[in-house]
Amino acid sequence: MGSKIFLLLGLSIAFAILISSEVAARELAETAAKTEGYNNGGGYHNGGGGYNNGGGYHNGGGGYNNGGGYHNGGGGYNNGGGYHNGGGGYNNGGGHHNGGGGYNNGGGHHGGGGSCYHYCHGRCCSAAEAKALEATTAQVKPQN
């Protein structure tokens, strides 16, 4: 009778260890998936960007270098942009269809912009927006 109790106790402990190791492995995998966005981040649908080669297939966010995506892809710092409605980027930005402009070599195939002529808080804007911003930020300098 005593050996059966020890056997059941041993099996219970082994089962508890098995469950806890499964939980620990799952948490470790989730942590690794969260930190994967630093380099070569992104995903298939609504994939977020990343530091280098970030982006995704659909609605992919941009990234620092080579960011962007296939559809509605956000821009990026260098070589940013995307295929359809792709946002621009700092250098070589733009996209194929309705591609947004960029700082250098910006533009796209259809409806794409070009280099910005007017900047408003670090982004391209129209001449009217730039003039309105200039009027609101102009200050009278005191004469000494």
Swiss-Prot record:
Transmembrane residue ranges: 5-25
Intracellular or extracellular location(s): Membrane
* sequence repeat copies, ranges: 37-42, 43-48, 50-55, 56-61, 63-68, 69-74, 76-81, 82-87, 89-94, 102-107, 108-113
InterPro entries from the xrefs? GRP
Pfam families the UniProt entry points to: GRP
Q: How does it sit in the membrane?
A: Single-pass membrane protein
Protein keywords: Membrane, Repeat, Transmembrane, Transmembrane helix
Residue ranges of the region described as 11 X 6 AA tandem repeats of G-Y-[NH]-N-G -G: 37-113
GO-annotated cellular components: membrane
**What domain of life is recorded for the organism?**
Eukaryota
> Would the keyword Electron transport be found if you checked this record's keyword annotation?
no
Q: Which family does it belong to?
A: Belongs to the GRP family.
Protein name as annotated: Glycine-rich protein DC9.1
Species, as recorded: Daucus carota (Wild carrot)
Q: Please spell out the taxonomic lineage of the organism that makes this protein.
A: Eukaryota, Viridiplantae, Streptophyta, Embryophyta, Tracheophyta
